[in-house]
């Protein structure tokens, strides 16, 4: 049994990760500014703001974890300035400061984001950044702050790709809802190929980093996700097939008009499932070289087909779809 601290433990990834760690009989403390998604996590939850160093220090030092998995962050794209994403910048600096004081710390995994580069851009190396959102810029600073701090303990940065599964939030839970409601349409040949990742496979990769030798993971950066990219067309058909739904094709021009309409509604703060930003993401190939993490975690435990069925079953149970 090991002692784990999970920041951002009330989020989608954190909730699933904590479930796995508890099932494996590890000791866990979860910190977040939001209440847990699962009532079973209430006893291990500590309400802590990463931007409050004193509060953070009190909880972490009293717990004295051996392993820290840092998932806590602001991840939406609605912020207007870098100050809006201070959890990803000042919060990370606070965490680095506190972790230096731990006596029994063995490894830390820091979660960054694939959005340190815009979709479709292939970086030359892990120091090549090209963010297209303020959120992405904040995650670039997350990585730079960690590297500049250069902690003495074993540390790894991971860049989650498009991770999905039970407890997920927008945009992928919305994608599932639209498909399962029969309101999704293919956009012909415009569909793209992307790296996605089922949550159980992501957790397997994280655990593989934790259990790997120091020389294989220390000061390293890994993209995490499923090893074969998906086409959104085939995945949507797979989701729809769980409910015997037939997806039809409509002209791409209709999506362009819908995106323009969505942009207009966004100006008056009305949500709409399609915007120009989302349409561009849906039609831009975006896949990554996962060969390095595959060396550490060669056999993903869950196929896309099984993950899709498990996720649909979860949505039926929780959203009455």
Question: Which ranges hold each PLM region?
Answer:
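Active-site Tyr-X1-5-Lys
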Residues: 130-156
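Mid/C-terminal beta-alpha module of Rossmann-like enzyme folds, strongest
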Residues: 212-274, 303-312, 319-321
């Amino acid at each position: 049994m090991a002692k784990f601290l999970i920041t951002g433990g009330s989020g989608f990834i954190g909730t699933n990760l904590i479930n796995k760690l508890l099932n494996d009989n590890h000791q866990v403390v979860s910190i977040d500014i939001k209440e847990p998604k699962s009532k079973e996590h209430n006893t291990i939850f500590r309400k802590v703001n990463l931007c409050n160093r004193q509060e953070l220090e009190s909880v972490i030092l009293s717990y004295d974890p051996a392993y820290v998995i840092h998932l806590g962050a602001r991840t939406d794209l609605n912020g207007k300035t870098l100050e809006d994403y201070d959890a990803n910048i000042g919060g990370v600096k606070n965490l680095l400061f506190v972790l230096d004081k731990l006596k029994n710390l063995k490894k830390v995994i820091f979660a960054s984001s694939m959005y340190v580069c815009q979709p479709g851009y292939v970086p030359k190396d892990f120091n090549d950044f090209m963010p297209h959102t303020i959120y992405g810029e904040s995650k670039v600073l997350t990585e730079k702050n960690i590297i500049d701090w250069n902690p003495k303990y074993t540390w790894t940065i991971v860049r989650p790709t498009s991770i999905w599964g039970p407890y997920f939030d927008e945009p992928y839970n919305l994608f599932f809802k639209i498909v399962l409601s029969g309101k999704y349409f293919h956009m012909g040949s415009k569909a793209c190929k992307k790296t996605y990742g089922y949550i159980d496979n992501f957790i397997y990769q994280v655990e593989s980093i934790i259990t790997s030798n120091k020389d294989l993971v220390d000061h390293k950066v890994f993209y995490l996700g499923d090893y074969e990219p998906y086409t959104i067309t085939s995945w949507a058909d797979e989701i729809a097939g769980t409910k015997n739904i037939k997806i039809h094709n409509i002209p791409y021009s209709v999506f362009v008009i819908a995106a323009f309409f969505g942009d207009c509604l966004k100006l008056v703060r009305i949500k709409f499932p399609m915007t120009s930003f989302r349409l561009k993401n849906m039609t831009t190939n975006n896949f990554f070289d996962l060969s390095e993490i595959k060396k550490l975690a060669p056999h993903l435990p869950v196929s896309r087909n099984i993950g899709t069925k498990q996720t649909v079953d979860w949505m039926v149970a929780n959203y009455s779809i």
